[in-house]
Amino acid sequence: MAEEKLTFIPTADLVDIIGSDVRSCDTQFRDLGGVVEFCGKITTVKCFQDNALLKSVLQEDNPGGVLVIDGDASMHTALVGDIIAGLGKDHGWAGVVINGPIRDSKVIGQMEFGCKALGTNPRKSTKTGEGERDVTVSFGGVDFIPGEYIYCDSDGIIVSDEIVQPV
């Protein structure tokens, strides 16, 4: 059976559709990509000040996917720069949500790619490959579970265990 198509729905409308069980992320992210409204199936990476693993994930084809990166809210080193964001864009990803900073924000802001992050820091991360992939990550009062769905816009982030249909 073919998977249902995911259609972007504004997060405020999703709250109205889902109701009191809504999973809305409390963390206040900055919209730093050239695309503000994006959605997709969640893939996760948990890493701390090291971006080698997430770079390898974004080199995989994943049309419409969203990579949720938990950098433990460390602002010490950027986890994504223009090269890594470009890899994601070129491999079909809709965007990234980063519990940490990015760098090269001017270039990323001009890409047709969604990018929500806590802020910016020009400092590079290490590249040892440490981290975990496809594990549940939690921040902002929400569990981000691989295979579930994320909807992002200027109002925030909503996560759902199933595709939500517009009403």
UniProtKB/Swiss-Prot annotation:
Cofactor(s) this protein requires: a divalent metal cation
GO terms for biological process, alphabetical: regulation of RNA metabolic process
Annotated positions binding a divalent metal cation: 104
Pfam families to which the protein is assigned, alphabetical: RraA-like (PF03737)
Residues annotated to bind substrate: 81-84, 103
InterPro entries, A to Z: RraA, RraA/RraA-like, RraA/RraA-like_sf
Top-level taxon: Bacteria
E.C. no: 4.1.3.17, 4.1.1.112
Catalysed reaction, written as an equation: 4-hydroxy-4-methyl-2-oxoglutarate = 2 pyruvate; oxaloacetate + H(+) = pyruvate + CO2
One function term, GO molecular function aspect: ribonuclease inhibitor activity
Keywords assigned by UniProt, alphabetized: Lyase, Metal-binding
Keyword Lyase on entry: yes
Cofactor: how bound: Divalent metal cation.
Enzyme class, UniProt record, top EC level: lyase
Entry-linked SUPFAM superfamilies: RraA-like
Entry-linked PANTHER family: 4-HYDROXY-4-METHYL-2-OXOGLUTARATE ALDOLASE 3-RELATED
Subunit structure: Homotrimer.
Function noted in UniProt: Catalyzes the aldol cleavage of 4-hydroxy-4-methyl-2-oxoglutarate (HMG) into 2 molecules of pyruvate. Also contains a secondary oxaloacetate (OAA) decarboxylase activity due to the common pyruvate enolate transition state formed following C-C bond cleavage in the retro-aldol and decarboxylation reactions.
Family note: Belongs to the class II aldolase/RraA-like family.
Protein name from the UniProt record: Putative 4-hydroxy-4-methyl-2-oxoglutarate aldolase
Protein's organism: Corynebacterium jeikeium (strain K411)
